[in-house]
Structures are given as C-alpha cells and as structure tokens.
Amino acid sequence: MATAVEYETLYTGQKIPLIGLGTWKSAPGQVKDAVKYALGVGYRHIDCAFVYGNETEVGEAIKESVGSDKGLSREEVFVTSKLWNNKHHPDDVECALRKTLQDLQLDYLDLYLMHWPYAFKRGDQIFPQNPDGSVQYDLTDYKDTWKAMEKLVKQGLTKAIGLSNFNKRQIDDIISIATVKPAVLQVECHPYLAQNELIAYCHAHGLVFTGYSPLGSPDRSWRKPEDPVLLEEPGIIAMAKKYGKSEAQILLRWQVQRKVVSIPKSVTPTRILQNFQVFDFSLSEEEMQLIGALNKNWRYIIPLITVNGKSVPRDAGHPLYPFNDPY
C-alpha cells in the first residue's frame, strides 16, 4: 500500500520528504489517527508546532508507529516543530524545545523552526493580550533567538534549524550572524502565492523551501464568500480530469516539480492517501506554466484578531511584520 517518496536534501545531508503531513488545525481526537494512518501509507515527514496544541497526540501516534518492533525506525521519519512567539527570549528557547520533545516523546527533532520573526510578551500565555484585544509584544531580536537555537543543534536536541514566515531581508539578517545556517524556510505557498522570487533566493542560499497551505487552506475559519477558491480553478479541474487525479493532487504535483516541499493537512484517510500519491505522473512544461500564471500574490494566512470589536490583522503593526516587503 505504501507509495515511494521523493526527497530534497538539506545542506546538513538530511533528506526531507517532498510531501509531509501538516497538523495545523487538526483537532485533538483526530490528529493521532491521522498521523498513524499517514505513517502507515508511507508518509515519512510530519510537520508540527507547539502552538497547534496537539503535539501530545502526535507524539502518541509516532510512539505507536515507530520503533524497532514496528518495521519503521526513528531515523526514517522527519519530524519538524516550531518555536512559538512567547518563547523567543534566549533563556526560554531550550525549555520550549524540551517541552515539545517531551510532548512528542522524542529524543531529538529533525528540524526546529522559528515560527514567526517577532516575539510576544514572555510567559506562558500563548496569545498575551492588551485590554483592547491587541497582542502584547516583546522586543527580543530574532538574531538573539537564533543564537539560542544554534545551541540546540550543538546539544543534539535538533539536527537542523530554520525559519518560518520570514522575508528575504530578515533571512539575510539571520545569515549575516549565523554560525549554524538556516536549513529551511517555511511559508505559505500555492499557485495564487507562487513565491517565485523567494524560492529562487532560498535555493541560491542553500535553503530548502517548504510551502504550507498548498491547497489554499479551504478549511480556514475566516474564509470570506468573495475569496478566490484555488480548488475551483477551471484549469486545475481540467488537468485533474486529464490525469484522473484530484485537483489537490495537481496542485501538489506542481510543487513537487518545483522542488517545493509541501505539507498538506488532512485528517481524512482518503485525502491523506491521495495527497501522497503524486509521484506517479508528471505535468508538462506548458501545464506548469499555466498553473504558475495563476499567481496573484494572494495570501490566505493572515492571522486576525478582534480589537475594539473590529477584525484586524493580528501583527501588521509590529515593526518585524514580514509581509510588508515584496518578498
């Protein structure tokens, strides 16, 4: 039943599967079965984060699926997690990773990402708030956070470190002070947000590029009726019919051929399996260009909060907000 998987290689020599299982928005009670099923059908890459609130269940699934007596070794599974914004202070970074390792029941991660470039107020509140509903920030410099993350590699707690939701200027900042280079950049990426410049930049600087929400996050709670729907694009539907594949498989194949790692989220077995079955066909160069031409720099994932009764972008006012730059 298992499908062969293709990989990209990090500068560390690690191999990261081009398709992984995303776990954002996967509810406790569902995510354990989803991870177990995914590992059973051949997934070898699980993408996690502390803020998703489900790492304990993900850990149970890994424990029940991986081990010398289960035919799947720990070394065969690539596990990513992410440092949340309230733990950016250098003194908090190691504790944050150790908490994730405890929840996942692992001795080490394959990759640990800084989830966002800006810090929230130190403490145990995941979303510390001001009285008006806005977020309480902290001015910890991400370069100082990075230096603390480098120590985690030297301690053997993670094999590689990387960045999420950083722009080019911010990645340059990190590279300028790094003694352990970032191995991966993870950002939103799909045909409406093709990220061509950022992908080219990453590949030129030795970073593997991972795209989250590769299907356009159709299950996002803040969806508006007027938002464009990627899975309903006529050209994508036509290609799906031509190849006898789902629209999701066409979108994921496009990323595979661009050497972009994708982490589609699902808790539905049929979709988990479908999302993985993208290595047995290829899109033509013309089809790749047609999909690429859908780019409109449309960002689905902009966290929103309610401030004084109005819905506003959560972090757009922060000086380190990454999405004001062109890329």
From Swiss-Prot:
It is found in: Cytoplasm, Cytosol; Apical cell membrane. Its EC number is 1.1.1.2, 1.6.-.-. GO terms for biological process: aldehyde catabolic process; cellular detoxification of aldehyde; lipid metabolic process. The active site is at Y52. NADP(+) binds at residues 13-24, 47, 164-165, 213, 215, 217, 265-268, 271, 274-275. Belongs to the aldo/keto reductase family. PROSITE patterns: ALDOKETO_REDUCTASE_1, ALDOKETO_REDUCTASE_2, ALDOKETO_REDUCTASE_3. This is Aldo-keto reductase family 1 member A1. InterPro entries: AKR, AKR1A, Aldo/ket_reductase_CS, NADP_OxRdtase_dom, NADP_OxRdtase_dom_sf.
